Curated annotation (Swiss-Prot):
Classification via InterPro entries: Smr_dom, Smr_dom_sf, SmrB-like
Pfam families: Smr
Source domain of life: Bacteria
Ranges in a coiled coil: none
Signal peptide: none
Gene that produces this protein: smrB
Name of this chain's protein: Ribosome rescue factor SmrB
Reported function: Acts as a ribosome collision sensor. Detects stalled/collided disomes (pairs of ribosomes where the leading ribosome is stalled and a second ribosome has collided with it) and endonucleolytically cleaves mRNA at the 5' boundary of the stalled ribosome. Stalled/collided disomes form a new interface (primarily via the 30S subunits) that binds SmrB. Cleaved mRNA becomes available for tmRNA ligation, leading to ribosomal subunit dissociation and rescue of stalled ribosomes.
GO biological process: rescue of stalled ribosome
Species the sequence originates in: Escherichia fergusonii (strain ATCC 35469 / DSM 13698 / CCUG 18766 / IAM 14443 / JCM 21226 / LMG 7866 / NBRC 102419 / NCTC 12128 / CDC 0568-73)
Enzyme Commission number, as recorded: 3.1.-.-
Domain Smr: 98-173
Family of the protein in this entry: Belongs to the SmrB family.
Assembly and interaction partners: Associates with collided ribosomes, but not with correctly translating polysomes.
């Protein structure tokens, strides 16, 4: 189907007359290159390996000594207890969130391992793990697993805005870790 021109025959003739003697410009200045692939993509094999490596830290048989009274909290022996206080007050805001709702214990361990590996790779030092209330299986196991991991510096029950007693704020040790300056 031929497109109708909105110009009158007179205007078309005038346009042709004015354009007589001109030639079409050859496009020779801009070269369109195909888009480059992102180099920062992490290979799938590496992600699977990180997940498997990180999940081997979590044992169901090992029971670390955690305080059962009050809010759930843990501070590694070489870390200041003030870090747990900062987590409780909400001085650290999590950059990554992990929701464990509906996962089995095995899946939850793998996801926790992947979260810690991702935090270390992306230099994220605070994450929120939402275990929920449910049947209290993940709520009881999550702190025990986190306390076993060598890169977990501290964790504390999350403030209300991040899930309250159904979540934990976790402080992860990354290379060259420096606490942020408080205003």
């Amino acid at each position: 189907m031929k497109k109708k021109s909105s110009l009158s025959e007179e205007d078309q003739a005038l346009f042709r007359q004015l354009m007589a003697g001109t030639r079409q410009i050859k496009q020779d200045t801009i070269v369109h290159r195909p888009p480059r692939k992102k180099i920062s993509e992490v290979p799938v094999k590496r992600l699977i390996q990180e997940q498997a490596d990180a999940s081997h830290y979590f044992s169901d048989e090992f029971q670390p000594l955690l305080n059962t009274e009050g809010p759930v909290k843990y501070v590694r022996p070489d870390v200041s207890h003030f870090e747990a206080k900062k987590l409780r007050r909400g001085d650290y805001s999590p950059e990554l969130f992990l929701d464990l709702h509906g996962l089995t214990q095995l899946q939850a361990k793998q996801e926790l391992g992947a979260l810690i590996a991702t935090c270390r790779r992306e230099h994220v030092f605070c994450a929120c793990v939402m275990h929920g209330h449910g049947k209290h299986i993940l709520k009881q196991q999550t702190p025990l697993w986190l306390a076993q991991h060598p890169h977990v510096m501290a964790f504390h029950q999350a403030p209300k805005e991040y899930g309250g007693d159904a979540a934990l704020l976790v402080l992860i040790e990354v290379e060259e870790w420096l606490p942020p300056e408080l205003p």
